[in-house]
């Protein structure tokens, strides 16, 4: 009997902050399961979830507006600790009898708050001390409105010159509010505050660990599928690879992985996937060489969105054909992860996040009646990687830079041809190899090469040549929503350029992309 790793759980109500998923990841890092729901959940849904504590997230709206989001009243009647962050603190204050006003002094960025009263939330936590020995905390503010009067049964725990109620608390009811973001790294003691709330105040045990998650997933897979056969589309990416390893541990040879080689993968990637999963780990893999089919479908197409749709459609066709060849397959496995499925149960107000459906494999043939199994659907990407390590997958594979689903199909600009893909594969491999050799690979968030469908004149020896151009792209980012181009050393860029032009016959010029996001996107197409 496996341990119930969901026994202690935190409910996070999302009011629309860009940091809300980060709050959830921080709680998970503390070893505690949590779920992220839209703010307008019902009392029945909260009761059914039975949380050990509730966190109210930040959000972009103003509590002073008439129709702005409010926490369900039951949140404050459930008898569990509640932690309001930024907007979450403001709606807590307002709903419990305090007052919030739009502030003339908006606070964005670093601030130092002074702890003026004792509280279980921050007891013994400090970054510095005032001259008279009071604790100071370095925090990250991001708010326009501010609480101007706290509810009568709350006390002020910390303040700044412009924010008299930076932390408020009702210790008896275990309600806490902070006017800053403890989940971001700029709030230096933020993880300690979250740990104090989740582990001490809510009394949650650290049951959510990679080893226990694996045991739980294996038990649930076995319970769900029994002795049935399962099929999985294996791409070699992180999500499908970890899904494959979990299923293999749970059901062994009853798993069949279909690996479709679309001709749009990185250099030697198909061979590496087959060697690792087939030869090394002993998974049952059906290898489908389909380069000609994909390239023929892409012939003559220049539009990036049309190329994506073609690649997706052909993949589904090929996968379906292979699935039909297998006998008695009852289940389709997918590597769906938690950010793909975060949603609210039917939102009454329409203010909840739009549901994002995500399918690694598209529609299945009507004659195939299969159940769906998604072993990773509770996990964030960083958790998937940790589980992959625990399952024995190599670090370099799990922590590779992101690679787009359509592969080189969107890194060859314009029409996709085999010649272009082959040149791009070799140029990109040189760039990545040199990044690793210079210990720069893990210092940038993503790096890749783009093939430009333009020719440029070059000189080789005594002759001139008229060959293709590639662009190197490297960016630094925290969340991939915004990004800076990476300031790679000139001598490094020169070395990469020389190697590509000398070793890849057909490329005469290498350029470096110095566009940030925004205005540019990270990928060119």
Swiss-Prot record:
UniProt domain Glutamine amidotransferase type-1: residue ranges: 9-207
Binding site residues for ATP: 235-241
UniProtKB keywords: ATP-binding, Glutamine amidotransferase, GMP biosynthesis, Ligase, Nucleotide-binding, Purine biosynthesis
Disulfide cross-links: none
EC number annotated for this UniProt entry: 6.3.5.2
Subunit-structure text: Homodimer.
Gene: guaA
Pathway: Purine metabolism; GMP biosynthesis; GMP from XMP (L-Gln route): step 1/1
Entry function: Catalyzes the synthesis of GMP from XMP.
Molecular function terms, GO-annotated: ATP binding; GMP synthase activity
GO cellular component: cytosol
Entry-linked SUPFAM superfamilies: Adenine nucleotide alpha hydrolases-like, Class I glutamine amidotransferase-like, GMP synthetase C-terminal dimerisation domain
UniProt protein name: GMP synthase [glutamine-hydrolyzing]
Organism: Shigella boydii serotype 18 (strain CDC 3083-94 / BS512)
InterPro entries assigned to the protein according to its UniProt record, in alphabetical order: Class_I_gatase-like (IPR029062), GATASE (IPR017926), GMP_synth_C (IPR001674), GMP_synth_GATase (IPR004739), GMP_synthase (IPR022955), GMPS_ATP_PPase_dom (IPR025777), NAD/GMP_synthase (IPR022310), Rossmann-like_a/b/a_fold (IPR014729)
Catalytic activity annotation: XMP + L-glutamine + ATP + H2O = GMP + L-glutamate + AMP + diphosphate + 2 H(+)
The keyword Membrane appears for this protein: no
């Amino acid at each position: 009997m496996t341990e119930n790793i969901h026994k202690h759980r935190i409910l996070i109500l999302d009011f629309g902050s860009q940091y809300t998923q980060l709050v959830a990841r921080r709680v998970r890092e503390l070893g505690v399961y949590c779920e992220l729901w839209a703010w307008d959940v019902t009392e029945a849904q909260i009761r059914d979830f039975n949380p050990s504590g509730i966190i109210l997230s930040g959000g972009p709206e103003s509590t002073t507006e008439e129709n702005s989001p409010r926490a369900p009243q039951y949140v404050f009647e459930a008898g569990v600790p509640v932690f309001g962050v930024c907007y979450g603190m403001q709606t807590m204050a307002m709903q419990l009898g305090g007052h919030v006003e739009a502030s003339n002094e908006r606070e964005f960025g670093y601030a130092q708050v002074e702890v003026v009263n004792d509280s279980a939330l921050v007891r013994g936590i400090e970054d510095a001390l005032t001259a008279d020995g009071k604790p100071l905390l370095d925090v990250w503010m991001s708010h326009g409105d501010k609480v101007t009067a706290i509810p009568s049964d709350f006390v002020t725990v910390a303040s700044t010159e412009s924010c008299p109620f930076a932390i408020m608390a009702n210790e008896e009811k275990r309600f806490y509010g902070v006017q800053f973001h403890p989940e971001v790294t700029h709030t230096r003691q933020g993880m300690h505050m979250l740990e104090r709330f989740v582990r001490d105040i809510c009394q949650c045990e650290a049951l959510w660990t990679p080893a226990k998650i694996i045991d739980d997933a294996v038990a649930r897979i076995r319970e769900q599928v029994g002795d049935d056969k399962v099929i999985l589309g294996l791409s070699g990416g992180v999500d499908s690879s970890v899904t494959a390893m979990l299923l293999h541990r749970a059901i062994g040879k009853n798993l069949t992985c279909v690996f479709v080689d679309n001709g749009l993968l990185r250099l030697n990637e198909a061979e590496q996937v087959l060697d690792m999963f087939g030869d090394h780990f002993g998974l049952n893999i059906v290898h489908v060489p389909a380069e000609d089919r994909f390239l023929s479908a892409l012939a003559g197409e220049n539009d990036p969105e049309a190329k994506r749709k073609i690649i997706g459609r052909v993949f589904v066709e090929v996968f379906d054909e292979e699935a039909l060849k297998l006998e008695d397959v009852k289940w389709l496995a997918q590597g769906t992860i938690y950010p793909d499925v975060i949603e609210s149960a039917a939102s009454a107000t329409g203010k909840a996040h739009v549901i994002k459906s995500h399918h690694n494999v598209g529609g299945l043939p009507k004659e195939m009646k299969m159940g769906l199994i998604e072993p990773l659907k509770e996990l964030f990407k960083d958790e998937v990687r940790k589980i992959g390590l625990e399952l024995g997958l190599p670090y370099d594979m799990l922590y590779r830079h992101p690679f787009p689903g359509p592969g080189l199909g969107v890194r060859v600009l314009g029409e996709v041809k085999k010649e272009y893909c082959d040149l791009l594969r070799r140029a990109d491999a040189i760039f990545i190899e040199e990044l690793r050799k210079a210990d720069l690979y893990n210092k940038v968030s993503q790096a890749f090469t783009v093939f430009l469908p333009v020719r440029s004149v070059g000189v080789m020896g005594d002759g001139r040549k008229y060959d293709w151009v590639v662009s190197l792209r490297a960016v630094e980012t925290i969340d991939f929503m915004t990004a800076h181009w990476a300031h790679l050393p000139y001598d490094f860029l020169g070395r990469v350029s020389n190697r590509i032009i000398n070793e890849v016959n057909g490329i005469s010029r290498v350029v470096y992309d110095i566009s940030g996001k925004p205005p540019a996107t990270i990928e060119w197409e």
